[in-house]
Amino acid sequence: MQPRIFHYDRLVKSEDLNHHGTLFAGRSAEWFVEAGFIAAASALPAKNIVCVKIHGLTFTQPVEAGEIACFESKIIKTGKTSLTVYVRLRVQEEEAPTLEGFITFVNVDELGRAQPHGLKLVLTSEEDIKLHQIALELD
């Protein structure tokens, strides 16, 4: 399979803000994981997916009330039982990401034990190959 980009957009409302009047990091993290889960669930049954680690969730600028938080996610690495998803957030028509990072999910059976998923990733774009290299170096 080739990486496929999934889009997940959210309107930043007053209840999403922190004491500085910008998007609360906790809300950002929640949406970040949801965006990653959507990509993972495109390849595996949702009931079999568990999040095991968020890697390097990095913010580069604040997000203001009324802005549209546009998340993009895609599977960028597969292991025997795991898959790693790259997620980035861009604010409406901004080119540079406001937030980016990786999430590792594991495929589990009905007892919650890791089980092989059989997924194989085919990387063709320069960006995907670069992101895959970064994902290989995650702890």
Where are the model-predicted features located?
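Hydrophobic beta-strand-centered segment that forms part of the acyl-chain substrate-binding groove
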Residues: P3, L23, F37-E72, I76-L83, ...
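Catalytic strand-loop segment that frames the active site of acyl-thioester-processing enzymes
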Residues: M1-A25, I129-D139
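Generic preference for hydrophobic/aromatic residues in regular secondary structure cores
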Residues: V12, I49-C51, L119-L121
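A eukaryote-biased signal for short, well-structured alpha-helical docking elements
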Residues: V33-E34
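HotDog/MaoC-like acyl-thioester-processing domains
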Residues: E64-A65, I76-D139
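Generic structural detector for well-ordered beta-strands
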Residues: D9-K13, T58, T104
